[in-house]
């Protein structure tokens, strides 16, 4: 790298040294030999610049080309992905519009079925509660009637005992015993 730099500087500064050595002023004619030497020096300069920098220039532009191609590929891939996503979203929107009515109908049907099921369960629970209440009421009435009968019998027996012990004489007792023996058959 240093060698190329030194050589480039020498090629650039050599014409300056040549012109400095000339020192004289020419007459009014066109110095074709001077122009010729300058053209040759300029050609040598450009040839040297091209010779020593062509690898760097070629690699620079090759790198730029590779970077550009890579960016173009990424851009093309991103565009393809975006187009695919666009088509996918467009299809989903079209499908959503088509299935919206069907989904609403299904939801309404499901809601109606659920409503019917809840009403049926509520009716079943209501009937069960009503039947249980009626059964409980009947059982309570029967129990109350039984208790009343038992109480009535106990009160009747007690009243009969009191009446029999106070008002019953020995002739009445003998008559009752005969009736008891005849009815029971002992």
Curated annotation (Swiss-Prot):
Assembly notes: F-type ATPases have 2 components, F(1) - the catalytic core - and F(0) - the membrane proton channel. F(1) has five subunits: alpha(3), beta(3), gamma(1), delta(1), epsilon(1). F(0) has three main subunits: a(1), b(2) and c(10-14). The alpha and beta chains form an alternating ring which encloses part of the gamma chain. F(1) is attached to F(0) by a central stalk formed by the gamma and epsilon chains, while a peripheral stalk is formed by the delta and b chains.
Protein name, per record: ATP synthase subunit b
Family label: Belongs to the ATPase B chain family.
GO molecular function: proton-transporting ATP synthase activity, rotational mechanism
Keywords: ATP synthesis, Cell inner membrane, Cell membrane, CF(0), Hydrogen ion transport, Ion transport, Membrane, Transmembrane, Transmembrane helix, Transport
Membrane-spanning residues: 5-25
Purpose: F(1)F(0) ATP synthase produces ATP from ADP in the presence of a proton or sodium gradient. F-type ATPases consist of two structural domains, F(1) containing the extramembraneous catalytic core and F(0) containing the membrane proton channel, linked together by a central stalk and a peripheral stalk. During catalysis, ATP synthesis in the catalytic domain of F(1) is coupled via a rotary mechanism of the central stalk subunits to proton translocation. Component of the F(0) channel, it forms part of the peripheral stalk, linking F(1) to F(0).
HAMAP family noted in UniProt: ATP_synth_b_bprime
Species classification: Bacteria, Pseudomonadati, Bdellovibrionota, Bdellovibrionia, Bdellovibrionales
GO cellular component: plasma membrane; proton-transporting ATP synthase complex
Membrane topology annotation: Single-pass membrane protein
Subcellular locations according to the entry: Cell inner membrane
